[in-house]
Amino acid sequence: MSEYRIEHDSMGEVRVPADAKWRAQTQRAVENFPVSGQRIERAHIEALARIKSAAAKVNAELGVLDEDVAGAIQEAAGEVAEGKWDEHFPVDVFQTGSGTSSNMNTNEVVATLATERLGRDVHPNDHVNASQSSNDVFPSSIHIAATAAVTRDLIPALDHLAGALERKAGEFADVVKSGRTHLMDATPVTLGQEFGGYAAQVRYGIERLQASLPRLAELPLGGTAVGTGINTPPGFSAAVIEEVARATGLPLTEARDHFEAQGARDGIVETSGQLRTIGVGLTKIANDLRWMASGPRTGLAEISLPDLQPGSSIMPGKVNPVIPEAVLMVAAQVTGNDATVAAAGAAGNFELNVMLPVIAKNVLESVRLLANVSRLLADRTVDGIVAHPERAREYAESSPSVVTPLNKYLGYEEAAKVAKRALAERKTIRQTVLEGGYVERGDLTREQLDQALDVLRMTRP
């Protein structure tokens, strides 16, 4: 039996692997783009298939396709959406900028599967791609996949992380520690206040995503080649988007302006920026956790993180903050992905952006990485954090910054002298004030001194 079969397209004949569900145009793309070995994301394949199914249904309702052909296409597209044929999507991410190769890959696989079901030919262009163009289908598929990933994966993952941080904020509400600005001692805070701040960062990330969703969920579907809707029957655009929204359960809407929606990718660029902001926030959180857990003997050691794996191939007993480090790498990747999306988003000329596949790859990867690492950070680090209250309080009470409440009794300059003397003589602020005769002179009473130097009270003025 031959290892190949002959397929043809408008450019002629092409040899295709005998068992491949794709056809000529996909094979040409495979041969033209052996670039990275990276294929489009699973979520993206699903989104393309959802469009093909919805389009077939609406085309049948509008008299463009026969019912049996449309039914076969819907069944085939359903299997593709479920992931049963992912190995038949071999086209590299770095391909034609409109995503035509991946759109045709979808058309051809669905056409082959539908032909097998129907017993007669289903054409990838005339039937599966009816009333469509790569120029409206592919950007729509990006927005569908990204909307699904953000709403179903990333937002729940961030909510999970925020909840873990909020629980720790409550647990550590009375654990007083030295505040730090510029990595230098500052007035006291509680560990709970810091964790509450981290939780708020994550919650605000969710708010940012939700704010960008209305534009992310707008689809140019139905605009076909240049946004005019040429070759579509009346009512197709609204009907097909309504069907995709129904089938996916996503809050998808028709683009308010099809020319903006095909010529520009501002909605997805905006979302990528929100993803970068979330990554920046996670970087801050992860670094703070690493600093507070540094040690065990020569660092801050205010908290302990769960021990997850040996940290060194040469130093026995060493354990490292591996999850926070993974978070930092994800954040760096997301920042780089956003730079790519920004550059690619600027690549629109007239009626079409021509860097769509790389936009899709980077945005969907960012969502996936952030969602995964947020869950890991919550489950394998935050939930297991243990505070060391005595150590934290010792730092807070020994910090020269606790002199700050004495400003109103001694004045700023005299309080500064106290702080410098305490540092130079390696004494506490309390010792220095008492030995300096400030109480004896009547600058303040011992009771006022006690209240002023109550480090927990300083966190709740």
Swiss-Prot record:
Protein name, as recorded: Fumarate hydratase class II
UniProt pathway: Carbohydrate metabolism; tricarboxylic acid cycle; (S)-malate from fumarate: step 1/1
Source taxonomy: Bacteria, Bacillati, Actinomycetota, Actinomycetes, Kitasatosporales
Enzyme class: lyase
Gene label: fumC
GO molecular function, one term: fumarate hydratase activity
SUPFAM superfamilies to which the protein is assigned, alphabetical: L-aspartase-like
Species whose genome carries this gene: Streptomyces coelicolor (strain ATCC BAA-471 / A3(2) / M145)
Cellular compartments per GO CC: cytoplasm
Catalytic residue positions: H182, S312
